[in-house]
Amino acid sequence: MKTIYIYCEGPTEESFINTVLYPYFFALGIYVRPIVCETRRDANRKYRGGVSRYAKIKSELMILCKSHPHEYVTTMFDYYAMPSDTPGIADATTDIFERINKIESIINEDIGERNCKFHFMLYEFEGILFSKPETFSLIAGDEVVTAVQRIREEFETSEHINNSPETAPSKRLEALIPGYAKIKNGTQLSDAMGIHTIMKQCPHFKRWIQDMAAW
C-alpha cells in the first residue's frame, strides 16, 4: 500500500482523517496518516495544533517530504486566518475556487518538493459540516437543524460560507449550539453524513480527494 501523509492543523482534522478519510482510502489501497502541526517544542513537551507562521509550515513540510521521498505529502489547513506571510494569501481573485487554486499553486512552487501538494479547507474544516444540515439532529434539536439549513441555503456551496471572525463556519456553529465540541461533534457529524455527501457539496474538497486517489 502506498502512504499519503496529511500534515494538518490540529486534533479536529486528525480525528476526521482517522475516522472518515482512513477507511475510504484504505479500500483503495492507500494508507493515510495524519501529522499534526507542532506550534512549538519545549524540552519535555510538544505543543500541537494551530498555525502561527507559514515559514514553520514550510520547514516542517520540506522535512516530511525529504524524509519520505517515495511517498506523498499533502495538507489540511483552514484558509481562514492563515498567517499573513503565506505566499499568495493576499490574492483578491473574486471566484473563491480560482483564488484558492492560485494560492495553492504558489505555495507548491515555494515549497518546491515534487511529492507535496498543498491543500486548503474552504474556508475552514467546519464548512464541510454544512453539507447535510439534517445530520445536526444527532447533536441538537429541530431549531438548530433549521438554522443550519437556512445558512446553507444562503451560499452556493458549503465551501462558500464566509470567513469573518463573526461568520466563519465554526463561529456560526458555536453560536447555534452551546457547548459545541469541535473534535467530538465535528467527527461525529462528518462521519454520519459520509465522505460522498461531503464531496458532492464541496467541489474543492472533492478535487483534493480525487487527486489523492490518483497519486
Where are the regions that the model predicts?
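C-terminal accessory helical subdomains adjacent to catalytic cores in phosphodiester-
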Residues: 14-44, 58-215
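Non-catalytic terminal and connector segments of soluble metabolic enzymes
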Residues: 48-54
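Long alpha-helical, hydrophobic tracts
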Residues: 10-12
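Extreme N-terminal starter segment of soluble prokaryotic enzymes
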Residues: 1-4
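Short hydrophobic beta-strand that contains or immediately precedes a catalytic carboxylate
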Residues: 6-8
